[in-house]
Amino acid sequence: KYLLTRSKCDFCQKPISYLQLVPIFNFIRSQGKSLCCNRQLSKSYIIGELLSYVSLIILNITTLPVNGAVLLLIYFSLLVLALYDIKTFSIPIHIPIIVIITSFILGSFYLLQGCFITMLLHLIFYCCKNCIGYGDILIFALLSFILPFSIFFLILWFTFLTGGCFSIFYIALKRSLKLKLPLVPFIFCAFIMVALFYPFLTWVVI
């Protein structure tokens, strides 16, 4: 029943026509507003639609030793979670559950590695609760189960490298230490960087 449910307007709950579901085209045609009640739509829609096409580039040029279906699964899951994290500073738990089950079915599953890294991540979380959110711990744990260690390590490394650089720049610009950042967008960016430049990054884990 859930899969057959029609998409509805965020505001008036009126069912959306199939033409309105065409990515990018409808957002431009409607000037970023809902056609049924003329209210401004979230910019996350157009951002998500534009970024979804990056997956085609990655799929065609990446040299990651990862199944194409798993690669797309991770990409779109992180994209959705990143946009959700920016808006709410939280993640919907059902998405990681769906991803890990699907990855297991697709044959991309590293049980012992995932268990060890997950325990280590939880230890870090309990020692540094104010430094990282539990949702971020869950995302890293998820990736440790479905990606080879070298790729997981690179994503982890680039996440904190880009997140740290952004934090320093933001603090210097705003002259304030009061900073709360959603981390999943940096995980998403790190995944893209690793997927695109993997052949040039292997020296990091050698």
Regions found by a protein language model. Give the residues of each.
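Long, charge-rich boundary regions
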Residues: S34-T102
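Alpha-helical transmembrane segments of multipass membrane proteins
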Residues: S52-L56, I117, L121, T162-F166, ...
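Functional transmembrane core segments of multi-pass inner-membrane proteins
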Residues: L73-I171, V205-I206
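Juxtamembrane boundary at the C-terminal end of a transmembrane helix
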Residues: L196-I206
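Membrane-proximal soluble regions of multi-pass membrane proteins
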Residues: K1-S44
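Interfacial loop-to-transmembrane junctions
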Residues: I168-M193
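Juxtamembrane "helix-exit" motif on the non-cytosolic side of transmembrane helices
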Residues: T62, F169-L173, F200-L201
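Internal alpha-helical transmembrane segments of multi-pass membrane proteins, especially GPCRs
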Residues: R39, F153-W157, P185
